[in-house]
């Protein structure tokens, strides 16, 4: 399983990165499968450096804040009006309840416009599982001001845990346990951001990974441009026993178990 960091800026696109978007790819029986985790503001442009968006097999939306879903409007335009490539049926989108209406509101101007001619929406459920080609996905409801999910993705012998946006919660333990890579929200800085129930800090992300047990790698993401990523890394390093990685736009990571 390959993970490509398309966008990793927190809360809004930054000067060097779009908002949240992560591309998973893997081969199965001679066919390349591609799944997106989130498609936030600015990410559709960057995605085209890595793959043809017309060839996606599914999109998983962690939640419906714009920095995680807004570019579905642009992808709808691409899939509807591309002069040379016809969309091959509707694209499966696994998302919290209400996603079709949410994206339709963003797409329309004077009124909500349907996007269900291009997308087939499936409502996520806590601990619910879906399979897309070689990817087995389990969704975990996490702690954020709106309905939000983390995803545990298994492909062959590799496991990725993506927290989406969350604060510390009980679901992080089964989400992260034994993962080859934890891709963790680190939007808050511990010494400054005292609000709870919204985001992890670097330290809280590391604490969750240690508590889960068996995590091989920890990568921090979703860092807003007003934060210094090295501060987030330093907070996590106080707890995490290994190297604390920082997600970088256009980075490609190959995942496999030892």
Residue ranges and their predicted role:
Residues 47, 72-75, 103-106, 172, ...:
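Hydrophobic packing residues within well-ordered alpha-helices of enzyme cores
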Residues 86-148, 155-156, 249, 255:
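Metallo-beta-lactamase
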Residues 36-40, 57-63, 67, 96, ...:
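Active-site neighborhood of phospho(di)ester-bond hydrolases with catalytic His/Asp-centered motifs
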Residues 42-91, 178:
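Active-site metal-binding motif and surrounding structural segment of the metallo-beta-lactamase
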Residues 168-257:
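Cap/insert and terminal regions of metallo-dependent hydrolase folds
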Residues 1-51, 148-164, 181:
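Conserved beta-strand hairpin/beta-sheet module of binuclear metal-dependent hydrolase folds
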